[in-house]
């Protein structure tokens, strides 16, 4: 009998959550992670499923996600503990046929429930499915230290944050040419912040929540982790630059355009045109 804890998706979630904890992005129960699966991924592990899966209604219907399985982190769970007890800290859920709710097929033991940011995740999954023609499968939220710090000292608008992050490290324009969306501060764990995040996810694979954290989307766990890691590295460089008195020189607009041409990407126009 195959054990679901040995599956690629449970092992992938263990690695991603452990790596994020080691990075310092997910203190206590901070952060959440969801991965969209296919029926073929979970079918071999049906014998591991709960005999009577709990059903939880969604706060709003998600018909685009009907019959779709996900693996998710749990509410109030610590990323550092996922590797110690995956079944207590992770769950495989499946949206019902009309998108009105989901069953917890595996994990989330002792009456645990999925992350409180599930509305933001599911709404963002819907938008990224449309934006990437189904390619993106992962939504990751974490408290990346230096990205948060920048939201206190830079004007919180997409063009400026994007441009500064591109300047902080040459690879950034190549990794996220679509730029970084940013919201006003909002109460977390609500449909409102979920809807606002999803709206930005129509245009950007990275979305900042000021004074709180970042949302990232990608086709795989590695790609999504790497996306956030790249932006966070640039933010760290910028924090050091500003602490040393600011930039004396930087990558120019012409150089950013040349970089985009070399790697075949189209940089966010508003960030390129900023200055």
Curated annotation (Swiss-Prot):
Keywords: Cytoplasm, Lyase, Metal-binding, Rhamnose metabolism, Zinc. GO terms for biological process: pentose catabolic process; rhamnose catabolic process. Gene3D superfamilies: Class II aldolase/adducin N-terminal domain (3.40.225.10). Its EC number is 4.1.2.19. Pathway: Carbohydrate degradation; L-rhamnose degradation; glycerone phosphate from L-rhamnose: step 3/3. It is an enzyme of class 4 (lyase). It catalyses: L-rhamnulose 1-phosphate = (S)-lactaldehyde + dihydroxyacetone phosphate. Catalyzes the reversible cleavage of L-rhamnulose-1-phosphate to dihydroxyacetone phosphate (DHAP) and L-lactaldehyde. Belongs to the aldolase class II family. RhaD subfamily. NCBIfam families: PRK03634.1, rhamnu_1P_ald. This is Rhamnulose-1-phosphate aldolase. The gene is rhaD.
């Amino acid at each position: 009998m195959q054990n679901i804890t040995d599956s690629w998706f449970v092992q992938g979630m263990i690695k991603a959550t452990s790596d994020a904890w080691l990075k310092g992005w997910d203190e206590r129960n901070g952060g959440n992670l969801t991965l969209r699966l296919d029926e073929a991924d979970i079918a071999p592990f049906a014998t591991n499923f709960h005999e009577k899966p709990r059903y939880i209604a969604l706060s709003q219907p998600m018909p685009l996600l009907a019959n779709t399985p996900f693996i998710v982190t749990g509410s109030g769970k610590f990323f550092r503990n996922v590797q110690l007890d995956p079944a207590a800290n992770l769950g495989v859920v499946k949206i019902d046929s009309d998108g009105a709710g989901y069953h917890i097929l595996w994990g989330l033991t002792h009456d645990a429930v999925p992350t409180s940011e599930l509305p933001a995740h599911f709404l963002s999954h819907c938008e990224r499915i449309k934006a990437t023609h189904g390619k993106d499968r992962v939504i990751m939220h974490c408290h990346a230290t230096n990205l948060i710090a920048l939201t206190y000292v830079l004007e919180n608008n997409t063009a400026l944050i994007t441009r500064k992050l591109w300047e902080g490290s040459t690879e950034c324009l190549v990794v996220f040419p679509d730029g970084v969306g940013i919201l006003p501060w909002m109460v977390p764990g609500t449909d409102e912040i979920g809807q606002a995040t999803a709206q930005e996810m129509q245009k950007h694979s990275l979305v900042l929540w000021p004074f709180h954290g970042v949302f990232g989307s990608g086709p795989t766990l590695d790609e999504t982790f790497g996306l956030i890691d790249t932006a966070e590295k640039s933010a760290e460089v910028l924090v050091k630059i500003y602490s040393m008195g600011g930039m004396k020189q930087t990558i120019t607009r012409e150089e950013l355009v040349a970089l985009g041409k070399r790697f075949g990407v189209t940089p966010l126009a508003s960030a390129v045109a900023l200055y």
